[in-house]
A protein has these predicted regions:
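Soluble extracytoplasmic regions of secretory-pathway and membrane proteins
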Residues: 1-469
Length: 469
């Protein structure tokens, strides 16, 4: 349009028309065009999600072997207090699968310009994520082109040099070790370009997972397609699907009834649920059950303007990007409300220097809980963890690591106590969970139930001298 006006302006030698052409170009090309392009991209993705996303009857159950317990803020404190290298500092962390468990992974990168110019990344530090205790492992491996190095030795420079036409998702970068090999990896995004004639003619781009870039300590980079990365044993258990594409998919559902409805009427328009400002961001990566270890991204949504009530939980596979949704007929408690409910408990409320943070979705059977951590204000450790039932609002407060895993196996314990089959030909070892009248876990004990056998469990209250079997 602006080009046609400019041609007419030149023929008529009209300065006013030339200015009009420039204004039209700026307004349509630099303002309206990108807005229209964004709306087209979201609308296309919403249509794709409607046809591809699976509707769930039950959310993926959380892993009972690897529970995401340790908040990033406490992990950061544990990691800093374990640093023994004055010329190095910790890179920002991400979740990494290592030796059968999940950890927060930190790169050990140079801390000053001289070391960054002449030195190398020293390796990585790992903090176990599956318990409340401090468990830190340091792996010393020199990377020729590591994180935090300058100029041509930089990890970022080498990757951009190799793949200059991809968007590199540095927020997905992680250090890891598998099969005796250390490596650094991150994902990239590419774009599928389209053109739409109306109502405003515009090119637009839809993001898609481009590749996974894996760098060895020697600096060699292997660029793999998402499919190749999913089949690589080196990346087993890792999550490498881009976080921003996962969010783009869910946010696109705001456009399911059209862009005008999203902007003006807002009928059936979702919004991403609020998270407390403690370092957690959507999507939240959670270890889930399956044939092999894996992480699932969770994103909670609520109706626009509804407050803190969740009515949908979206899940995105941490490797394939496959999307699914659990819809609720009645509003569920959101993560912010779960934190509020935890802070109201007398045990937490009476603590003068503690706060409830980092709600993480945990699914046990058909029940959704928000797993909230009560930590000291200095983030020096976890005081309590709380399981907040998203349907009823009931809060179960536990202390230490063992009761967390005991809580998640309560249904299995109840099956044994009710005389149902254990489902194992050789018997089964289980955790017996003892709760008081308020539902608090006051004790746990491992027991072995023989095949076809029964076990009597006697519990004695030493205060009231009452017992039950």
């Amino acid at each position: 349009v602006s080009l046609l006006i400019a041609v007419v302006a030149i023929k008529r030698e009209s300065f006013r028309l030339l200015v009009t052409a420039a204004v039209v170009f700026v307004f349509l090309g630099l303002i309206v065009g990108p807005i229209a392009g964004g709306a087209y991209a979201h609308t296309d993705m919403a249509n794709q999600m409607q046809s591809d996303a699976k509707e769930l009857e039950t959310l993926p159950n959380s892993s009972k072997e690897n529970v995401r317990v340790l908040p990033r803020s406490v992990s950061d404190n544990y990691a800093r207090s374990s640093m023994q290298y004055p010329q190095y500092k910790l890179r920002s962390s991400d979740i990494t699968y290592r030796n059968g468990s999940y950890t927060w992974s930190y790169g050990l990168e140079p801390d000053n310009p001289m070391v960054a110019l002449s030195g190398q990344q020293r390796g990585a530090l790992y903090v176990d994520i599956t318990g409340t205790e401090k468990q830190v492992t340091i792996e010393e491996t020199a990377f020729s082109n590591g994180r935090g190095q300058y100029l041509f030795d930089s990890y970022r420079y080498q990757n951009v040099l190799r793949s200059p036409f991809k968007k590199h998702n540095w927020d997905t970068t992680f250090n890891a070790q598998a099969n005796g090999k250390s490596y650094i990896a991150h994902s990239t995004t590419t774009y599928k370009w389209k053109f739409r004639m109306g109502p405003i003619p515009q090119f637009y781009a839809i993001p898609q997972h481009g590749s996974v870039e894996v760098m060895s300590p020697s600096g060699d980079i292997e660029s793999m397609s998402p499919k190749e990365a999913q089949e690589l044993s080196l990346l087993q258990g890792q999550n490498f699907y881009p976080y921003d594409i996962a969010m783009f998919k869910v946010k696109s559902m705001q456009y399911v009834n059209g862009a005008l409805n999203k902007w003006l009427w807002k009928e059936d328009v979702l919004q991403i649920a609020n998270l407390p400002e403690d370092g957690n961001n959507w999507p939240i990566a959670v270890p889930t059950e399956g044939d092999s270890p894996g992480l699932t991204y969770f994103i909670a949504t609520e109706p626009t303007g509804s407050g803190n009530g969740v009515y949908e939980i979206w899940t995105i596979d941490g490797q394939t990007g496959e999307a699914a949704v659990q819809q609720y007929s009645e509003s569920q408690l959101g993560p912010q409300k779960a934190v509020d409910f935890t802070e109201r408990r007398s045990e937490v409320n009476q603590l003068s220097s503690a706060e409830a943070i980092a709600p993480v979705p945990v699914v046990n059977g058909e029940t959704l809980y928000w797993h909230v951590k009560v930590v000291s204000e200095s983030n020096s450790g976890i005081i309590y963890t709380a399981f907040v039932n998203a349907e009823s609002g009931d809060v179960t407060l536990v202390e230490g690591t063992d009761p967390i895993y005991a809580f998640l196996t309560q249904s299995e314990v109840e099956e044994i106590q009710n005389g149902t089959e254990a489902g194992s030909s050789g018997g089964m070892s289980m955790n017996v969970v003892v709760t008081d009248e308020a539902g608090e876990i006051v004790g746990t004990q491992n027991i072995t139930v023989p095949e076809g056998g029964n076990v009597d469990v006697s519990v004695t209250d030493k205060i009231s001298n009452r017992s039950s079997t």
